[in-house]
A protein has these predicted regions:
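HIT superfamily nucleotide-processing domains
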Residues: 2-179
Length: 179
């Protein structure tokens, strides 16, 4: 066991060794209300109204709210109400419409909350990769203005790093994929 763990930690595949994908973690066939009721994450608590929230947007399928961590003047999150694991690398071509919708909500929030940053393209839309996330429910970070973030925030949201993925890059990759 010790040798296997050391091997996992020594490779670029650390996340998949420590947190293998759960093949049952795709969208459920449960009614949305039941899916929300069974959601064990803090986002499930927010969706059920069990914890305070500063909503930025809500519609039938998505919720956007302010992050409790103030990474930027606008530090928002966009989540699908139906729980999906926080595994952007595990998403497939069939998930393009989900990501397009999440991106659209994030851009609407950015345009409303930080219009100057939006007009100047001074914003980031990022996913954290496994295992570098704190809530295992798919969520997209919207940060604006990006020019105002700290150097630490810039590091933890560095697009293309082993821990962070740009939403547009992910969408482009999925659109080009064959599966």
């Amino acid at each position: 066991m010790r040798r296997r763990l050391a091997g996992c930690l020594a490779t670029a595949q650390m996340a998949s060794c420590l947190f293998p994908p759960n093949l049952s973690d795709g969208p459920t066939n449960l009614p949305l209300a039941e899916d929300i009721e069974k959601n064990p994450t803090v986002f499930g608590e927010l969706l059920r109204g069990e914890a305070p929230i500063r909503k930025l947007h809500e519609c039938e399928a998505y919720l956007s709210f302010r992050n409790v961590k103030n990474y930027a003047p606008l530090a928002g999150l966009v989540i699908p109400k139906r729980r999906r694991p926080q595994d952007p690398d595990g998403l497939r071509k069939v998930d393009v419409s989900l990501l397009e919708d999440m991106r659209r909500v994030a851009l609407e929030v950015c345009q409303r909350e930080q219009p100057e940053a939006f007009a100047a393209n001074d914003y980031w839309l990022r996913f954290h990769r496994r295992p570098w996330h704190s809530v295992d429910h798919l969520h997209l970070h919207v940060l604006a203005p990006a020019s105002k973030v700290s150097s630490w925030t810039a590091f933890i949201f560095l697009a293309g790093s082993p821990w962070s993925l740009d939403a547009d890059a992910l969408l482009e990759k999925l659109r080009r994929s064959r599966e």
